[in-house]
């Protein structure tokens, strides 16, 4: 096998037969050889890494997105490398600065709201940049996601069509969670168009958990016992709320309806299926990775809008 062929196999480039490829890779494994990607990157000005910047690893949403990205990059020679911002703009700036210094082949990052410094770095990077999870705004390069305003409005339609009118909202008091804020804005706007106002709202600090959902649900229903529907900003607190209501004898969905957001697998294990919205997380990850890998062309307007889908579940009255 020639040096050129070995080089092509190790760089995952060019047309090499499967048998020859396997022979080269077996020899490399036997020798414990790991190619120096930085040296290779100096020649091409790019390494085979895709920077993936997300706000949280504890949030159940992002592992699904990462799964979609990883599955789509699997046959490309590109590897996702993850940075976490904890919903902090300054942390996002630092993560992007470090990751872009490696000259990755592309960047996938959550959200459309970034600091001026982050936007400047991404504008000047000269590589594919895909902002994910949201399409309500103007992308730097390409956006792949759902409209959270639309998701909120469509859930409002569903709740009103089922006959509920005394509606409360429970969500995070996190100013940097722009997508949750847009969902609530779309939700309230649609309620207002139908002559209904939110009857109560309860905000919490920090991350979402079943316990937080239980506590917030108890608090809002103690304060406003006449509520007939609770809209939660995500499934985790919605699931906690559902468990609290069931333990306390609420007639669901007759006396009280509940809905969350995301469509996470956790809901499969609950005694009742929580009404929610599928946020298309795996599809978003896949489509973003396809654009970075060059499998799919960037759309002319830079936006790939997927449709949020309501999953009716069992916690809303049939209508």
Please report, for each region that a protein language model flagged, where it lies by residue:
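N-terminal helix-turn-helix DNA-binding module of bacterial transcription factors
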Residues: 1-48, 317
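N-terminal helix-turn-helix/winged-helix DNA-binding helices
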Residues: 29-67, 75-78, 86-87, 98-101
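Hinge/beta->alpha junction and helix N-cap segments in small-molecule ligand-binding domains
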Residues: 55-64, 82-91, 144-154, 170-216, ...
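Central regulatory/effector-binding core of bacterial HTH transcription factors
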Residues: 71-117
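Flexible loop/hinge segments that line or gate small-molecule binding clefts
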Residues: 87, 110-154, 196, 236, ...
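Periplasmic-binding protein-like
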Residues: 103-111, 168-171, 203, 224-234, ...
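Short acidic capping loops at alpha-helix termini that bridge into adjacent secondary structure
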Residues: 166, 198-201, 252-257
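Flexible loop/turn connectors
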Residues: 218, 223-319
